[in-house]
Amino acid sequence: MPSALILYLNYFIHGIGCSILGQAVIKEALAASWGVEAMAITAISAALGLGRLIALPFAGPLSDKLGRRISTAIGSGSYAIYLIGLALAFNAGTNGGYTIAYVCAIIGGIANSFLDTGIYPAVAEIIYKAPSVATMGIKFFIAIAQMILPFVLGATVATTATGLVSYNMLFYICGVIYVVLLVLVMLFPLPDADQKAAGKKEGLIDSLKHTHFSIESVAMILIGFTCTGTFQLWLNCAQNFAKENVGWADPSIMQTYYSAGTLIALVVTALLTRKIKDVRFIVAYPVICLATLIVVLAGQSKPLMIAGAFIIGWAGAGGLLQLATSVCNMLFPKIKGTITALVMIASSLCNYTILTAAAKMQPSQVMVMNIVLTAVGVALGLFVNVRYGVLLKNAEEA
């Protein structure tokens, strides 16, 4: 169990690292140092998705070949570079600070892929009697970290000699923790059960060569894109909307409500899936998100922003992507490995493309884009649900 705790702590700090650039106060501090608009920091968040996209094709095979320990160590070390790099980029200011941060964010995205491919199977092997609980533990640690983030920001804020607001203390602390976790990962025992079977596994490119994709399977892959866009656009841009359109001076507490929604959803959705088919959630949750986004855009008030943060955290980030992969495995058993990989690639592609586009928009325009993207997700979810009976019958006969 000490090994499992070390692995979970990697995701606790990841919970801060993956959402820190979405905080309005962080954006403003970095933007002031680099001489750019606050929304331009969203492009740095997009670079995380680019790094993840770059690493996806080889992180998994390397994890199987080299073992969970090496994969996790690469992830921890790379994440330390990303976080400490953000502090160094802030210090660089207009002398290449933005470029340094972009490169470090790509490294952070690569770190994310290696943590995923190392830690997900490792905790499932450690807690082998309850692998679903092991996976839920990862999401739990991420949500807890994101919930306390606004309070951590308040405790680590400082002012530089030149009068700039700085959060470098937080970047350095998290980076050093990852270095410590890297050392612990190398010292404590980790399972490598899948390493023996690495040579027998077919690569994604090889499997694509002889895989037939139906319209429904393509729809499921696209849902990986749309559902990711819903919560990523909110996570990275909603606080800017609250500041500029609602007039909320410090909306960072929205992160706590968002994470609370995610945390509760992890438990409640797990219970609901015992009574309700997984496929129903891939239309129900996007519908809830769509209605929420429309109300928030139309109402523009603090109470609506708080309620919106909680609801999007629940219905958008509370396991919808994982439910989509679960439906893929059920409906397309012959290509479940391939289609699941493609869903995750679509998710990473969304992180990069949508956030890159958002960096060039006003917060209200981003909200409209999120509404359109979520509406497409609703249409895709409806299509898969209409076809569900036929697809399930085909899967059972396969």
What is each stretch, according to the model?
Residues G22-Q23, H212-L263:
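Extracytoplasmic gate region of multi-pass secondary transporters
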Residues A55-R68, A265-D278:
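Helix-to-loop junctions at the C-terminal end of transmembrane segments
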Residues G77-N95, I288-Q300:
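C-terminal ends and interior cores of transmembrane alpha-helices
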Residues C104-F140:
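Cytoplasmic helix-loop-helix junction between adjacent transmembrane helices
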Residues F114-I127, G318-F332:
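Intracellular juxtamembrane helix-capping segments at the cytosolic ends
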Residues K129-A130, A134-L190:
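Helix-loop-helix hairpin linking two adjacent transmembrane segments in secondary transporters
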Residues K277-L323:
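C-terminal transmembrane helical hairpin of 12-TM major facilitator-type secondary transporters
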Residues N329-P363:
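A late C-terminal transmembrane helix in Major Facilitator Superfamily
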